[in-house]
Amino acid sequence: MYNDEVKFSLWCDFIERDFLGGEFVNLIQNGVISGVTSNPAIFKSAFTTSEVYKETIKNSGLKYPKAIYERLATQDIKIAATKLFKNYANGDDGFVSIEVDPTLSDDAAATTDEGVRLYGEIAMPNVMIKIPATKAGFEAMSALTSRGINVNATLIFSPEQAMGCLDAFEEGCAAYAKKFPQTPLPKSVISIFVSRFDRLLDERLRQSSLPTGQVGIMNAAKIYNLIEDKNLPSVRALFASTGVKGGDLRPDYYVRELMYKNAVNTAPLDTVKEFIKERAEPKNAPSAENINSFFEVIKRAGIDMNAVYKELMNDGLKAFEVAFNEILRAL
């Protein structure tokens, strides 16, 4: 873990074959990162811009684009999982996430089946199957957890989504523990998206003469507190979408501000590099009272957070589907 004192972990939200063979190993060995996450947008960039994949595609013998995509993705995930296995074996995270086909986000059975299949194909115990936090996704999370499969619940914007994930993991872990009482529970993370709130709302807040760059942090803190209060032993809060795109914020702002006890932060590679340049101190999450007061001000500014949650979730699902379909067209 990046900070053992408060059990704060830093993971890298990036995966690419050349990176896995060099810089990735150095970051692990130096104790900077202890996990890695991926998504269709990350794989799209890697598969369509890096020369290293062309030979694999040429020699794959596979006809269908999705089969080629899965071959490339599972190879990268397995390489990463192998390099992180020592961390995993020592109880120091070591997890690697791969997302199911995002076009299945409303189909619980298909999501579950694909998660089981991908987990089996990669055949590494430190793989997490990444599932969007939709209603169908909650069912799949419970089903996979009950089978002993680690899950990364993704695209969490609202407290209600987080509670759905917590209920699913609690149910799945209970079913698994009943079948295998002497076996450790599968691990899960609830990925709370952060920076997208500020990119969406900051201009409106400026027009109301309100501080910017805070909605994402306060919303993340609210959900983090829910997760910590639930106190499920195998579930942690993970902060995602923590890169800064333009504006006046320092590049590692969302990592430094969310360096909470027992939390994970997955950040783009450039953000990770920026973060380790200067020592960072752990922080305490704001109290429920302070968070509620903050969102009362936001409400008075005419911002409907429920509408914001819905917009960001729809945009997130669409972005992953677009990236996934663009990969398939390119392959």
Residue ranges and their predicted role:
Residues 1-23:
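N- or domain-start disorder-to-order transition segments that initiate the globular core
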Residues 13, 125-134, 149-161:
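Catalytic beta/alpha-barrel core
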Residues 21, 107-113, 131-145, 158-169:
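Active-site-adjacent beta->alpha loops and helix N-cap segments on the catalytic face
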Residues 32-34, 140-151, 170, 185:
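Glycine-enriched alpha-helix->loop->beta-strand junction motifs that scaffold or abut catalytic
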Residues 39, 98, 129, 144, ...:
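Conserved, mostly hydrophobic/aromatic
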Residues 42-44, 49-140:
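Active-site beta->alpha loop and helix N-cap motifs at the rims of alpha/beta catalytic domains
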Residues 150-270:
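Catalytic alpha/beta core domains of metabolic enzymes, predominantly
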Residues 233-330:
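Flexible, acidic glycine-rich loops studded with aromatic residues
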